[in-house]
Amino acid sequence: MQKTSKKCMMLIVCLIATTAAMAQWRAGVTVGAASNSLDIDKQYQYDWRYNNRWGMDFGAVGQYDFTDWFAVRAELNYLQRGYSQHRTGMNAGTEYKYRHNYLVMPLMASFSFGGEKLRGFVNGGIYGGYWLSGSVKGGFKEHEDDGIVLPIDQDYDFNSTRDNRWDFGYVGGIGVEYRWAAHWAAQVEARYYYSVTSITKDYMLIKDGRYNSTVSLQAGVFYIF
């Protein structure tokens, strides 16, 4: 019994030592573009149409590789999310183009597979974010008959009763990594952010939930310690 226990302990120690020997840190930067749309129940807004908008996505990455196939990854990213909305019918001419700037922090598990130089990977986890600032452009048709559209070009004016600036959700991605040197690697990734918090609070009798849905295409360079 004692011999069996000793063998088990030795096996555990060997596994820990092997994992520690293979483990390594890496740090890097990423840059890309993001397309955002709103998941929204328009309800009474029958004459409004919503479309996606593109923005920037860039940030810093830290990753700890436990093995050659499993790692934990944390990021701090600047993510631009936007959308446009316009009216149809008699109110055609009214249009707003929003751009919202977020600071987001994804925390993900990363699973990789493939050869020594060229590898595929899948990331998945959660994120938290904060709505830093925004802008709105477009035009407002004041009267249905005269056809005059008043231009709009200004910073977004936050309203604490209406706007929910904290954001939380799920994030996942798939990509390819190429390691061209002992300590250097490059990645390309397609990523999806799914928000579970509305950008608007429940401040009206009729619920007006609006949820960001963001697809990001990005490339990054990493230094492996």
Predicted segment positions?
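Start-of-domain marker
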Residues: W25-A71
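Hydrophobic, lipid-facing positions within transmembrane beta-strands of outer-membrane proteins
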Residues: M56-A60, L103-L107, G120, F168-I174, ...
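Outer-envelope beta-barrel architecture signal
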Residues: A23-A27, D68-V72, L103, E116-V122, ...
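Bacterial N-terminal signal peptides that target proteins for export
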Residues: M1-M10
